[in-house]
Amino acid sequence: MAQAQIDEQRRLQDLYVQLKKEINDGEGVAWLFQQKTYTDKDNKPTKATPPLRTTSSDLRDYWTKLECHNCHEEYWQLTTYYCKECRKCEHGKLRHTKKECEQCACKAAQETSA
């Protein structure tokens, strides 16, 4: 029993060290824990504050400010489903949604109809 507790404690320490390394390197899930608040002159958060602030320039550009159709309140939404390596389709076009580019969709339609 004591050996199992020691093994578990060692495993948790290793995970903690790995998490600290990812945060220091700015990789992995570290960007989720970093947020910058924009404030007005009364030091209150403004609507310009996105839900999360990323340290990664690749991810930062894909936050889009949208407006609610019902109450017209503005909110931020992440507009990409892909990492830096997978963002481009085989035709070299950037994709921010799950939809394919026109060439990819046309090719897929031809393959399914054949």
Swiss-Prot record:
It is found in: Host nucleus. It comes from the Viruses. GO terms for biological process: viral DNA genome replication. Pfam families: Amdo_NSP_1-3 (PF12475). Signal peptide: none annotated. Keywords: Host nucleus. The keyword Cell membrane does not apply. One of its GO terms (cellular component) is viral replication complex. Transmembrane segments: none annotated. Plays a role in viral DNA replication. This is Non-structural protein NS2. It comes from Aleutian mink disease parvovirus (strain G) (ADV).
